[in-house]
Amino acid sequence: MNALDVYDGLTERRTRFLRVDELCRLAVQAGHLPDPAADAGRPLKEKKHLELAQGAFLAEILGDPDCGTHLCHSMLLPRKESLELQKSFEKSGNAEFPGASLRREGKAAVLTMSNPGFLNAEDETTLAGMETAVDVALLDPATEVCVLRGGAVTHPKHAGRRLFGAGINLTHLYQGKIRYLWYLIRDLGFVNKFYRGLAKEVVSPEVDSIEKLWIAAVDGFAIGGHCQILLTMDYTIAAKDAYLTLPARKEGIVPGAADLRLPRFVGDRIARQAVMAERRIACDSAEGRMICDEVDSPEKIDAAILRTVEKLTGSGVVSAASNRRAFRAGQEPLDMFRRYMAVYAREQAHCHFSPALISNLEKNWKVK
């Protein structure tokens, strides 16, 4: 199988946009990939690794400048569901999604991440809802700036407390409830939309896109994937008692695009310590303030959000998208991201099915 020929065939020589999951589904139907349905319902340790072929397939596509850029463009387009829901949100200013809620408050759309029984962890139950919420916030004409924060949780250890998020749901991962494609849909999808906005079909996302500034407010902690998200934000507020970690080594996976983005904030040495040696970064430390723009006492976070919204919108937001594009041109153009994701697609597939991942989950996290 030549993945590039398959991609050109399924996308009609790159004139048709297909999301990662739809692309792989059609490739399975055409006999180019094994059907991962045979592994559905099995715990991770019992899977037959049928999804490894998806990793090799997507790595080859993303490694090609033409096909890879087209796939990145596809994943930056709004979901079909988002275009339908945007109109109702425009009228009501409120929307509920699996794993997230969206509320317009003055000039801001406030997106609250919610998976209360799992410390707001990310999994298959939150993925589509989260991306749809991001789309709707960016599409809303009455919104000038977006705010991202975690909701209150019900987990016994932190019941009633607002938390930013605990990263990937390790229990679901161990139980085999998170597929390999979850990583690619997430990082090519809503996480990249935080950073690049929404693409338009008729023009490169490098040239034109639908963008708004994003403000994050960190209560408690931002672990793993939630720390990765902070690296895409335009402004981050954190509580003084909050902390950040990227326990990728202890989990046994690649931490999204953090290996690409974190060194820009804290330098190579600290980034490697965070990823390879589980360095915990207090938000109120010198290193934490390289990621967090403002650190305040927990009871003052709400006021800090309001103040920041006014600060970023007080003179209008006409240049916000232009400045975001200019920063990206110097820091992370789409082609750099594409090349990183080609490596990520291949390496994460091997990590996801590694016996070491199972061992780490059982030993370090005691999941069942």
Region roles according to the model:
Residues 204-317:
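Crotonase-fold acyl-CoA enzyme core
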Residues 105-115:
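Short, aliphatic-rich beta-strand segments
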Residues 118-119:
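Extended acidic/polar regulatory tracts at the flanks of large eukaryotic scaffold/adaptor proteins
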Residues 1-106, 153, 282-283, 303, ...:
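C-terminal alpha-helix plus adjacent terminal tail
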Residues 111-112, 129-211, 215, 235, ...:
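A structural preference for short, pocket-lining loop segments at secondary-structure junctions
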Residues 111, 148, 169, 229-230, ...:
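Hydrophobic/aromatic residues within transmembrane alpha-helices
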